[in-house]
């Protein structure tokens, strides 16, 4: 069985964290296109369907990085709820992704993915 989920989430959360705090229309458009292409590339047909359905019901919020991060956080929790996995709080998300990703960039560590890999 291919375990692509943790890598998908890591990439999605990274994109949101590094999204601009003052995006222009072009950056917002590119983010929307990136998300659509990313969802389309999911290896699981049912997952693609669920992701597009979630996006339709919960449009992207691209006012700034924090809004985009919150959207990815809510999306991840939505999937975890459907899969009967752990739901995390916003503060847990911030701790897992923001701080861990910054540490990864600074120190070249990659072990942070384990924090949510079993969720």
From Swiss-Prot:
Disulfide partners: 44-47
Reactions accelerated catalytically: 2 R'C(R)SH + O2 = R'C(R)S-S(R)CR' + H2O2
Record EC number: 1.8.3.2
Induction notes from the record: Expressed in the late phase of the viral replicative cycle.
Principal location class: host cell
Location relative to the cell: Host cytoplasm; Virion
Key words of the record: Disulfide bond, FAD, Flavoprotein, Host cytoplasm, Late protein, Oxidoreductase, Virion, Virulence
Coiled-coil ranges from the UniProt annotation: none
Top EC class for this record: oxidoreductase
Reported cofactor(s): FAD
Pfam families (alphabetical): Evr1_Alr (PF04777)
GO cellular component labels: host cell cytoplasm; virion component
Domain ERV/ALR sulfhydryl oxidase stretches: 1-97
Keyword Oxidoreductase (UniProt): yes
Flavoprotein found in the keyword field: yes
Superkingdom of source: Viruses
Example of a GO MF term: flavin-dependent sulfhydryl oxidase activity
Family: Belongs to the asfivirus B119L family.
Function statement: FAD-dependent sulfhydryl oxidase that catalyzes the formation of disulfide bonds in viral proteins produced in the cell cytoplasm. Involved in virion maturation.
Assembly and interaction partners: Interacts with A151R.
Name of the protein described by the UniProt record: FAD-linked sulfhydryl oxidase
Record organism: African swine fever virus (isolate Tick/Malawi/Lil 20-1/1983)
């Amino acid at each position: 069985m291919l375990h692509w989920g943790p890598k998908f989430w890591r990439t999605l959360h990274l994109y949101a964290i590094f999204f601009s705090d003052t995006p222009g229309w072009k950056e917002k458009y590119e983010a929307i296109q990136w998300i659509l292409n990313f969802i389309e590339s999911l290896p699981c047909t049912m997952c693609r369907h669920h992701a597009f359905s979630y996006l339709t019901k919960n449009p992207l919020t691209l006012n700034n990085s924090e809004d985009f991060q919150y959207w990815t956080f809510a999306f991840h929790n939505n999937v975890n709820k459907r899969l009967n996995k752990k739901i995390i709080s916003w503060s847990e998300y911030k701790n897992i992704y923001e701080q861990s990703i910054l540490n990864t960039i600074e120190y070249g560590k990659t072990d942070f993915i384990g924090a949510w890999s079993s969720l």
